[in-house]
UniProtKB/Swiss-Prot annotation:
Gene: mnmC
Region: FAD-dependent cmnm(5)s(2)U34 oxidoreductase, residue numbers: 260-654
Localization of this protein: Cytoplasm
Principal place of residence: cytoplasm
Keywords: Cytoplasm, FAD, Flavoprotein, Methyltransferase, Multifunctional enzyme, Oxidoreductase, S-adenosyl-L-methionine, Transferase, tRNA processing
Family according to the record: In the N-terminal section; belongs to the methyltransferase superfamily. tRNA (mnm(5)s(2)U34)-methyltransferase family. In the C-terminal section; belongs to the DAO family.
Cofactor (UniProt): FAD
Descriptive protein name: tRNA 5-methylaminomethyl-2-thiouridine biosynthesis bifunctional protein MnmC
Amino acid sequence: MTDRIVPATLVFREDGTVVSPLYGDIYHSAAGALAQADHVFIRGNDLPERWRHKRTFTIVETGFGTGCNFLATWAAWRADPSHCERLHFVSVEKHPFARDDLRRAAAHIVAYTTIEPLVDALANAWPALTPGVHRLEFDEGRVTLTLAFGDALDVLPNLALRADAFYLDGFAPSKNADLWSPAIFKSLAKLADEHATFATYTSSGAVKRALDEAGFAYRKVEGFAGKRAMLVGEFAPRWRVRRHEPPRALDVGTRDAIVIGAGLAGCAAVERLAARGWHVTLIERRERIASEASGNPAGVFHPMIARDDNLAARLSRAGFLHALNRWRALEHAGHTFARSAHGLVQLATSADEFELMRESVDTLGVPSELARTLSRDDAQALLRTDIAHGGWLFPQGGSISPAALAAAQCAAAGDRLSRIAGVEVARLERGGDGRWLALDASGATIAQASVVIVANAADAARVAGLRHAPTQRVRGQLTLLPPGSAPAVPLPAIGDGYVVPLANGVTLTGATYEPDDADTTLREAGHRENLERLERLLPAFSAHALDAHALAGRVGFRCVASDRLPLVGELGDEAAAARDAAALTGARLRDVPRAAGLYGAFGYGSRGLVWAALGAELIAAQIEGEPWPLERELAEAIDPARFLIRALRRGRVA
């Protein structure tokens, strides 16, 4: 289980500097936080000169604190007309400030400067204080702040990125020795680009020894505000210090991509690539986007909570929070889509389950902005109908129109998107020039590009030619209830099934779960099952009061992997793995040969709304060589090659 986040306590000294009572040290020099950031970290890493005319530039910071280093760097990037196209700032923080405290601390530091407006932007975007990686975007996505909340000893080895510069800015080594330990510098060495630099205000002997042992060359330069010396330097290992190289951008001649499948997964990928300047061809076998499972009238979105905070729970939390950020960005850009705004309730199915739910929230220290426990009376008042048990309220959860969201994502791509509808891709082939060809059943080329993303659910593995990607097609039938026939709940509720109020007074409920059933027709038995489930969820509803045969509904099909997690990322090269099978029996995922330029985004099951945006961002980051938007452990849990590596270890690849 991941450790809960303990926020920092905001304390000001008489001279106005921010101090940590936990560590007994100041966050910045009394001579000025912004001046210190400029002298030590920006100039200490030869910025802005080193980021000029680059596509991306990545800075890694140990200790976010008040955010003044990020704010100063962002301001310097804005002021430089030759800045890199995309600036990535990745910062690790064990004790982040709560939003209001961060706003107060940062506003105090930058008062009466041109940086003041940036503080509001940062504070407004500040995430819930939950463990893990949080990605925030500013200046239309050209500046990205990736926050990693947790102990640096645990977090740094779990990051996937290639760093161009390091800001080493923890509290003094005498106050917080862990952040200056050899283990920290070894982790940084595994992230460093071959030309990476670093800067730090300290010049202690222990830090110099740890830097040297990790492969960093250092030199003393004049310190800040009368301090005699500080350290700067570069990554210059005299021996091999890492087994695997940090991720690089995909080497392509032309920045164009094919996305197969115009559902939630595919349209999210289109938007993320187009935002980075890629030209994308979207191929959909139907005439319209979101015609399969993504065409449901509404879908619910919420994170999972598990007492042990397992992989699925962490992934759903990361996906949920990332999706909210992406949707807000779309709305801010003027793209509209219907989504509810008053939260979502998850109801327990028994008194024992309610106690487990309550204990889970308390044990994990879940922030109230993410979820909070509701008593039976509170839940009943919120839903305005009788219920049997309490549960959770997800204040930011709710329902959304998947088709409208997909349309907004395509609209955001603008003229970087080309669509091919009513055409089915039968297979993929790599041309002699290394580009991918999408072929129809006759072998004719539909489109070609440097990159292909298969996002067509249960057909993805077949189109990509994968043998080791076990997915299952699961039929789901939902039911539409006419106005006045069900309790008029004001917000979505889930538990044993779900109920969603639609704008026209119709109530949506469902859905059945029928593996390996390809029937596309509505069935009375399916409606009856949904009605009985709704009766258990909302006892005031009578399943027998309606004629199930006369009800409207819809049938869709989920794509579910054997381990119930999605398949997202670069696909394995199964042919190459078969040739080297004997050497790969003890391999790790990073050792598996990959089909360069071929990616997957499928197997989302019933959680496409929660996982699609994060999956698209992960693929875009992998293609561009950017910091990944989630921990490596989580990325490996959804890596499409995980099934291939399992087969290799069992000697089942030939």
